[in-house]
């Protein structure tokens, strides 16, 4: 029955029409939430609030190295989902061996990748006695050799673009939808302004674009400590307005 008489005053309510309107408004709310914060144009830039993730030292592993470190047939198990859909902090840990010292219980992130890599902060590199490059991933020719030890074995990553250790370049994950809307290109460099106890602007945020990604800037612990922020706080991404 499409219409029901209101008990109080005899008015009729179009239930079907009301339901459609409620669903329409809910759809708008969901779409706005998924789209995230909207940019504001100011002084030749789009200023867009962006969540910041502080990346603690961690390891990515290829399937072959998972088997060596944790045993044949072992699969990484999820401990906690990360902000990016499909990515997680695994329950597994490894020991990272440097020239001077070792760092134990370094978290593995999943899922597995085509090659293994170790992402560290400069402070970690000093503890290990390593001189590490700033790079985007373990396929970078400048990545350094490093040894990982797990409960079932050890593996040495060769570096030089074949998987290794490096200091992660400050970067952001951007969805293809946001990129198209703002005219941003993959591997473009943008600036990030951060308010707080130590307000600053970080230059050279490398943009990496992929369908389905959630917009998020990644800094390492040294950078986060330097500007006094933690994961989950927001900064302002500065995107030049194209003519």
Q: What are these model-derived regions, one by one?
A:
Residues 51-99, 104-187, 191-195, 203-234:
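Short beta-strand-centered segments at strand-helix junctions
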Residues 232, 238-243:
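C-terminal functional extensions of proteins
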Residues 1-40:
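Short, low-complexity, charged amphipathic interaction modules
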């Amino acid at each position: 029955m499409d219409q029901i008489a209101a008990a109080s005053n005899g008015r009729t309510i179009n239930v079907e029409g009301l339901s459609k309107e409620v669903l329409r408004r809910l759809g708008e709310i969901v779409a706005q939430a998924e789209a995230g914060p909207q940019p504001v144009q100011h002084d030749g830039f789009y200023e867009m609030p962006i969540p910041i993730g502080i990346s603690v030292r961690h390891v990515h592993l290829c399937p072959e190295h998972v088997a060596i470190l944790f045993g044949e047939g072992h699969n990484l198990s999820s401990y906690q989902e990360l902000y990016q859909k499909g990515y997680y902090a695994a329950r597994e840990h490894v020991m990272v061996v440097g020239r001077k010292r070792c760092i134990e219980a370094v978290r593995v992130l999943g899922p597995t990748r085509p090659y293994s890599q170790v992402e560290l902060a400069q402070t970690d590199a000093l503890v290990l006695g390593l001189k590490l490059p700033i790079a985007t991933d373990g396929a970078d020719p400048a990545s350094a050799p490093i040894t990982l030890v797990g409960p079932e074995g050890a593996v040495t990553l060769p570096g030089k673009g074949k998987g290794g250790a490096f200091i992660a370049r400050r970067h952001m994950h951007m969805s293809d939808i946001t990129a198209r809307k703002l005219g941003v290109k993959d591997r473009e460099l943008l600036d990030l302004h951060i308010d707080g106890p130590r307000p600053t602007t970080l230059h050279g945020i490398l943009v990496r674009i992929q369908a389905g990604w959630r917009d998020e800037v990644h800094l390492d612990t040294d950078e986060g400590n330097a500007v006094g922020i933690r994961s989950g706080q927001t900064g302002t991404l500065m995107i030049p307005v194209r003519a």
